[in-house]
């Protein structure tokens, strides 16, 4: 009897010890530098804001916050590599609707949305269609005239498994155009391609194209949004203004490995939220041209879930 009771007592003590250790690990996390991986090109909006955020990591985490880049296949390489991480990892990764709603439909990927937990949204961005001034296209009506010439149109986008690629293909398909999506390893490269005349059009972030449009190096055609884009540079109709439901707002959010303890997810959320609310960081974001849009993980998941149907409808058009 004593042996039986002793065994139970030992088991309970061991179990309580494991709970205590696990609880302590959650409380002490992070115990090493925290890294946020950007799965897209160096110099792009996501990379710039990630590097800016890293400057304020130490005061929030008590550990250095590092910015890293892993490139390839529009983000799929980094996201696939990230699935090797264990729950409670010190590495996080950026992603968005392109990573999870579009990529699995346009290419074979070795990861699932369920492999990740959204932590916090960093920014949201409207895409615009821009062109080289030589095309003389500056609106949907003039784009229709250009398409009517029957020429095969080349459109630069950040990869093929991206919101840019999907929206471009959807719009040009619905307009009856002959088109080809030309993928690049980043939004900057896609924009450079249209400015140089390597391609006819590019779909990119409105904020990224703004200075080039202002300088006359590129012409803005239409905003991929449900409302007009009007500011000190743009005065653009939306695709919805012309009857096309071919739009998605780009999101850039931070994710961590599924199975991570909620306490660690919460710690990341609060630390990153504090960084994003720092006035110095907000000024940097403004200088970059980023519209910070802080949302919790539940809101990020809800948005990505909502894009699944639209992505499924248009994904086969990316060619």
Q: Residue spans of the language-model regions?
A:
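Bacterial N-terminal signal peptides that target proteins for export
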Residues: 1-12
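N-terminal signal peptide c-region/cleavage motif recognized by signal peptidases
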Residues: 20-22
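Glycine-rich beta-alpha junction loops
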Residues: 98, 159, 205-208, 224-228, ...
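Hinge/capping helix and adjacent helix->loop/strand transition within the periplasmic-binding protein
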Residues: 32, 81-90, 97, 104-189, ...
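Mature extracytoplasmic/periplasmic domains
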Residues: 273, 277, 282-303
């Amino acid at each position: 009897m004593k042996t039986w009771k002793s065994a139970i007592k030992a088991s309970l003590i061991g179990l309580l010890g494991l709970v205590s250790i696990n609880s302590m690990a959650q409380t002490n996390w992070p115990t090493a530098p925290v890294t946020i991986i950007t799965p897209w090109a160096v110099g792009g909006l996501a990379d710039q804001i990630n590097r800016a955020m890293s400057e304020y990591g130490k005061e929030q985490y008590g550990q250095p916050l590092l910015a890293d880049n892993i490139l390839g296949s529009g983000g799929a390489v980094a996201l696939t590599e990230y699935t090797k991480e264990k729950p409670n990892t010190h590495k996080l990764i950026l992603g968005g609707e392109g990573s999870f709603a579009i990529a699995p439909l346009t290419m074979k990927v070795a990861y699932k949305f369920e492999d990740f937990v959204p932590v916090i949204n960093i920014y949201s961005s409207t895409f615009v269609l821009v062109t080289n001034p030589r095309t003389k296209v500056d609106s949907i009506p003039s784009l229709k005239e250009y398409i009517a010439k029957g020429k095969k149109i080349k459109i630069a986008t950040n990869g093929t498994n991206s919101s840019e690629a999907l929206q471009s293909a959807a719009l040009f398909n619905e307009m009856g155009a002959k088109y080809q999506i030309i993928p690049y390893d980043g939004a900057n490269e896609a924009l450079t391609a249209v400015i140089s005349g390597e391609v006819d059009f590019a779909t990119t972030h409105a904020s990224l194209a703004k200075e080039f449009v202002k300088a006359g190096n590129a012409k803005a055609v239409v905003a991929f949004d449900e409302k007009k884009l009007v500011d000190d540079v743009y005065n653009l109709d939306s695709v919805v203004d012309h009857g096309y439901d071919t739009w998605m707002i780009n999101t850039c959010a931070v994710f961590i490995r599924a199975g991570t303890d909620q306490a660690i997810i919460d710690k990341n959320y609060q630390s990153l939220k504090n960084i994003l609310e720092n006035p110095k960081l907000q000024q940097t974001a403004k200088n970059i041209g980023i519209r910070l849009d802080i949302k919790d993980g539940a809101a990020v998941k809800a948005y990505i879930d909502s894009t699944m149907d639209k992505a499924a409808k248009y994904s086969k058009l990316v060619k």
